[in-house]
């Protein structure tokens, strides 16, 4: 939820920051030139495995509608060692760091040009800080890449008639390899600037919930291929940002459809939930090529969306504990019924389990539509959608397999099939009926 422009070529502010004890490495050479190219150069590549620049990513994700210009300043050196700004939380004094950075670049920057929506505030100041970060090292004393507001720490910064409040930051180096990172974390954090939320459980330290994993850049996908190849924004993100107008399907009519890869055609289907304008399903075709090369699988991804404003505003759309909706608001319907990190390759249809049908329920537990005959011919998906067959082609009477049991929306509900109430579940990758 944001008023920042998501079309055209708006300017964005980026600053390179060094600490008393950490400077940019020899890998990046001239840091300003390196980051100017990493963010802006068309058809970019480098020796560290980059699949493109941030410009390339946004141009591809938006089908050419959004081509931002990133102005890079610095490097500037702040007054303390990195551990001081990181503190015990990984971001304890980063607001102070932002305050110092603004003072250091004030003479060469007209901050007013970075208020692209005219609300009196700089849209965002993005900081690349020298060295490694805490997220991919687990090392205390390093800053955790994040998105925040300095006003939450008591700072009021105003220059050139505009307020500098919101910022985001990420590290220079890969925590494992020690080489420069690609644009994965950058396009994730900048996604927040555009108005899209995290899709992981932001309270994951208190839960064990799996959401959409490597399938999405706003979840763990930002780390795909060492952050060099984040997956393109999904049909849901494109829809939210005004980059796609999905084709609406009426589930009361049985129809055969085909779908080319989202990366090639920028096309998706939307299945509405009756009497619920904020709830719907999105169908997209994802194939492992280009920016999507490092997805965990390929085929049809079915998104179940609930545009719950409170959950979006709190950045809690998929939280297990604090989500105002009481359920995941932006989730993938797992084809194999297993919502785990180890089974991500089975999330798509037909997927590794060759699951060619599915029945999809609203959050009120009402059947909305069925899909059958889901198949892939090269990159092309074909399927039949309607409200007819349940997709259960035959019934056999057997005991359920040992192992966890999932609801039809992919939520793990039991360690085994014993003592379950009546209903239809997923166990061992198959539907089971408890009577």
How should each PLM-predicted stretch be described?
Residues 390-435:
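C-terminal outer-membrane/trafficking sorting elements
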Residues 10-15, 123-125, 182-183, 216, ...:
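Residue-level detector of short, conserved catalytic/binding motifs and their immediate flanks
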Residues 118, 189, 276, 408-410, ...:
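Short, ordered coil/turn segments that flank beta-strands lining enzyme active or ligand-binding pockets
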Residues 190, 237, 242-243, 261:
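C-terminal accessory segments of proteins
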Residues 15, 271-273, 404-406:
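A short beta-strand micro-motif
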Residues 1-211, 215-226, 237, 312, ...:
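Active-site-proximal segment of zinc-dependent metalloprotease catalytic domains
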Residues 1-5, 384-399:
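Low-complexity, Pro/Thr/Ser/Gly/Ala-rich linker/spacer regions in secreted
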Residues 25-37, 41-65, 69-72, 137-176, ...:
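Non-catalytic C-terminal accessory/binding modules of secreted extracellular proteins
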């Amino acid at each position: 939820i944001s008023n920042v422009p998501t079309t055209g070529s708006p300017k964005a502010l980026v600053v390179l920051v060094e600490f008393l004890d950490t400077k940019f490495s020899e890998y990046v050479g001239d840091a300003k030139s390196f980051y100017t190219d990493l963010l802006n150069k068309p058809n970019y590549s480098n020796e560290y495995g980059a699949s493109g620049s941030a410009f390339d990513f946004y141009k591809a994700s938006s089908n050419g509608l959004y081509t931002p210009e990133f102005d890079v300043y610095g490097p500037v050196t702040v007054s303390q060692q990195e551990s001081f700004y990181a503190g015990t939380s990984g971001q304890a004094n980063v607001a102070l760091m932002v305050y110092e950075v603004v003072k250091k670049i004030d003479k060469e920057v007209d901050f007013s040009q970075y208020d692209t929506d005219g609300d009196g505030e700089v849209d965002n100041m993005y900081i690349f800080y020298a060295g490694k970060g805490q997220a991919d090292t687990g090392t205390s004393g390093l800053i955790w890449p994040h998105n925040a507001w300095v006003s939450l720490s008591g700072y009021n910064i105003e220059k050139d008639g505009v307020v500098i409040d919101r910022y985001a930051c990420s590290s220079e180096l890969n925590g494992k390899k020690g080489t420069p990172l690609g644009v994965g974390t950058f396009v994730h954090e900048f996604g927040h600037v555009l108005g899209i939320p995290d899709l992981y459980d932001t309270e994951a330290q208190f839960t064990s919930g799996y959401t959409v994993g490597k399938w999405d850049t706003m979840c763990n996908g930002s780390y795909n291929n060492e952050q060099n190849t984040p997956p393109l924004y999904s049909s849901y993100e494109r829809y939210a940002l005004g980059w796609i107008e999905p084709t609406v399907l009426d589930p009361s009519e049985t129809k055969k459809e085909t779908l080319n890869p989202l990366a090639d055609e920028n096309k998706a289907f939307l299945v509405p939930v009756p009497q619920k304008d904020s709830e719907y399903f999105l169908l997209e075709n994802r194939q492992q090529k280009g920016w999507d090369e490092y997805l965990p699988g390929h085929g049809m991804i079915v998104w179940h969306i609930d545009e719950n404003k409170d959950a979006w505003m709190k950045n809690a759309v998929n939280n297990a504990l604090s989500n105002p909706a009481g359920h995941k608001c932006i989730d993938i319907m797992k084809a194999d019924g297993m919502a785990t990190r180890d089974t991500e390759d089975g999330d798509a249809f037909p997927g590794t389990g060759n699951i060619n049908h599915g029945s999809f329920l609203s959050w009120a537990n009402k059947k909305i539509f069925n899909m059958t005959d889901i198949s892939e011919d090269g990159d092309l998906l074909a399927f039949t959608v309607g409200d007819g067959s349940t997709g259960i082609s035959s019934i056999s009477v057997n005991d359920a397999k040992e192992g966890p049991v999932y609801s039809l929306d992919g939520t793990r509900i039991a360690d085994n099939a014993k003592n379950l109430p009546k209903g239809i579940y997923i166990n061992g990758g198959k539907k089971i009926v408890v009577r």
